[in-house]
Amino acid sequence: MSQTKPNAKRLKRTPLLIGLALVIAVVVVGGAMMAGGGRNSKTIEISPTPVVSDDIQQSLAAFRGKVVILDFWATWCGPCRMEIPSFIALQNKYRNQGLEVVGVSIDPIAPRGNPGGAPAVAPFMQSNGINYTIWMVNKPTALRGYDVSQGIPTTYVLDRSGQIVRTYVGVRPQSVFESDINSLL
């Protein structure tokens, strides 16, 4: 009996330790973002595989003149995965009217031991039928100007001039984004 009590205590502490590790990871990423940096960018084109972006703000310049839904997510994030069908539907419905959905995977900078990581992104895109641009960031400074320290999914709605008009933390129904899109197109 004395052996089960320490194991039971350890099992009760495990979720707390996991939660603490996630909070620390978010704080570290948020702090690194606030430090700025990373001014180089690569040309970004729509691709069936993720493209590395060294600076999200510079990469977004390719979409000036379009309304952009910019979603920060990860393959291992359950709430993020819940929103993907909505983003697929929005891209299908509004692409020809000037909408661009862009997903930014933070998998490459996820905490060690996380089941995601850069190798998980391309297969995830294919198996989920993602029809919109996916960028990956390989360093926290690439997120400069976008705060994801409160958690993911974090989604920004940008107008045609590239200005942020809405920010959402957590899952939102498709109707919320449709309302934003319709007011901006």
Language-model region placement:
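Solvent-exposed loop/turn segments at secondary-structure junctions
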Residues: A74-G78, I106-P111, P140-A142, V171-Q174
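N-terminal targeting signals for export/organelle localization
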Residues: M1-D54, T167
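Conserved redox-active cysteine motifs that mediate thiol-disulfide chemistry
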Residues: F72-A89
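Thiol-/selenol-based redox modules, centered on thioredoxin-like
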Residues: G151-L185
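Short, internal strand/loop/helix patches
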Residues: A118-Y156, R160
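Thiol-based oxidoreductase modules, predominantly thioredoxin-like and allied folds used
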Residues: Q97-G116, I130-K139
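A short beta-strand-turn-helix
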Residues: S47-V68, Q91-Y94
